Design a protein with these regions (language model features):
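N-terminal secretory signal peptides
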Residues: 1-19, 32
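N-terminal export leaders
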Residues: 19-28
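N-terminal cap/lid segment of alpha/beta-hydrolase-fold proteins
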Residues: 102-145
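Short beta-strand element of the alpha/beta-hydrolase
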Residues: 148-157
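Cap/lid segment of the alpha/beta-hydrolase catalytic domain
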Residues: 156-245, 302-304
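Gly/Ser-rich "nucleophile elbow"/oxyanion-hole loop immediately N-terminal to the catalytic nucleophile
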Residues: 226-270
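Mobile cap/lid helix-loop segments that gate and shape the active-site cleft of serine hydrolases
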Residues: 233-234, 289-333, 353, 357-361, ...
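C-terminal catalytic histidine-bearing segment of alpha/beta-hydrolase fold enzymes
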Residues: 367-405
């Protein structure tokens, strides 16, 4: 399965080829008709048409739609000049577009399930009410010693692989049936490491929970995502909004544990998990810092022909309908300013254009500098790397957490 999904990987093997061929054939014919290049029948009136949606592509008027996106609520563009007021209004605007109400359901945790020992830390499962809709089972790692400890909310990627979620980042110690898949994922993206285990070994409490559709809460299939998203919209809810609310709830649960120093809680994620990390930092006061690996771009720059995000499906986990009429991706992340935030990007990452990364970084830099907190924003690009989170990068992130928490 080649790399290329905005959350980690592209369509499952074979899907892209068949859809792409159909899209080419249909799209080519439609393009000829819509641009007036097709030869009309004898005696027929020639009509130039526009406003098409060729199969598998952007609408032909997408440049006009992009021109209409001015992101008027962005800091520096918005008429609001007081940053605290702007942050409050911007956060409220994001929350309005989640289509999922805030949740104050009691967590009612059950600790101590499936305990095990790691290298300097203890593993256990914890079951708690993530939302009013149900309880989930999380992986909770606690360093040996006396707390309270700093903590990391670890947010998994997408990758078009649904049999594992939290196990992509925390070694499955009680379910051997998931170990082979988890190890293969770690080998592919994380230099063979389990990021959560490494964080716990370095002294951090770690919580990882399956997003809706993965692991214990799935598995869904790639093809079912679009229907799942549509059904939630029809029920007045949102797939992306649900994930955002759940991540905020998970942050609150982690920060409230007795073993955790609630002033030193960070969010960390790779790919879709990176999107989740900066989004959670923007929406939750329980997150003091965030590290985002391989997901930051300007919206206009990622919405280009051939980009993976155009396929739909996985994109629904990161799509808040209508929000783009107010804020760009880096504008949402900027709601977290002036918290310490680290963004890592691979220069060879096929999912994000260099221009998109540049635009996003410039916006982020301007916001943190406006708060006289430029030193709290760390933007790093590794020209030789693609869509990966390597062992040296992991060490960089943990060292950075050590310095800011």
């Amino acid at each position: 399965m080649p790399a290329g999904e905005p959350a980690g990987d592209p369509d499952p093997a074979g899907t892209r080829r068949s859809v792409g061929r159909r899209a080419f054939v249909v799209g080519a014919g439609a393009a000829a008709l819509l641009t007036g290049t097709a030869t009309p029948a004898a005696g027929a009136e020639r009509v130039d048409l526009a406003g098409a949606a060729p199969a598998g592509a952007l609408p032909d008027f997408h440049p006009l739609l992009k021109e209409e996106l001015r992101f008027p609520l962005a800091w520096g563009t918005s008429p609001i000049r007081d940053f605290r007021t702007w942050r409050r209004v911007a956060r409220a605007t994001v929350e309005e577009h989640l289509f999922v109400a805030p949740d104050d359901t009691a967590y009612e945790p059950e600790f101590g399930g499936h305990r095990g020992e790691g290298d300097g830390f203890t593993r256990e499962t914890v079951t708690f009410s993530l939302t009013r809709y149900g309880r989930v089972r999380g992986a909770l790692l606690t360093p040996h010693g006396t707390g309270p400890f700093p903590a990391v909310l670890l947010l998994h990627d997408h990758g078009a692989t649904f049999d594992i979620g939290k196990e992509k980042l925390v070694r499955p110690w009680f379910d051997e049936s998931r170990l082979a898949s988890a190890q293969a994922w770690a080998d592919r993206y994380f230099s063979g490491r389990f990021v959560g285990d490494e964080l716990a070994r370095r002294g951090y409490v770690v919580l990882a929970v399956d997003a809706f559709g993965w692991g214990d809460r799935g598995p869904t299939t790639y093809e079912e995502q679009q229907a799942l998203a549509s059904n939630l919209y029809n029920l007045g809810s949102s797939l992306a909004g649900l994930m955002a609310r759940e991540d905020v709830r998970a942050a609150g649960f982690l920060a409230g544990l007795d073993r955790v120093d609630r002033r030193r809680v960070a969010a960390l994620g790779f790919s879709m998990g990176a999107f989740r990390a900066w989004q959670t930092a923007a929406l939750s006061d329980d997150i003091a810092a965030a590290a985002s690996v391989c997901w930051m771009t300007g919206l206009k720059e990622v919405m280009v022909p051939g980009n993976n995000i155009l396929r739909g499906q996985s994109s629904y986990y990161m799509l808040h309908p209508g929000l783009a009429r107010h804020l760009d991706f880096p504008d949402v992340a900027s709601i977290g300013a002036p918290k310490p935030m680290l963004f890592l990007h691979g220069g060879q990452d096929p999912l994000f254009t260099q221009e998109g990364v540049r635009v996003a970084h410039e916006k982020l830099r301007a916001v943190w500098r406006s708060r006289h907190a430029g030193e709290r924003l760390d933007l790093r690009i590794r020209p030789d790397l693609g869509h990966v989170f390597t062992a040296p990068q992991q060490d960089e992130v943990v060292d950075w957490f050590d310095s800011v928490l």
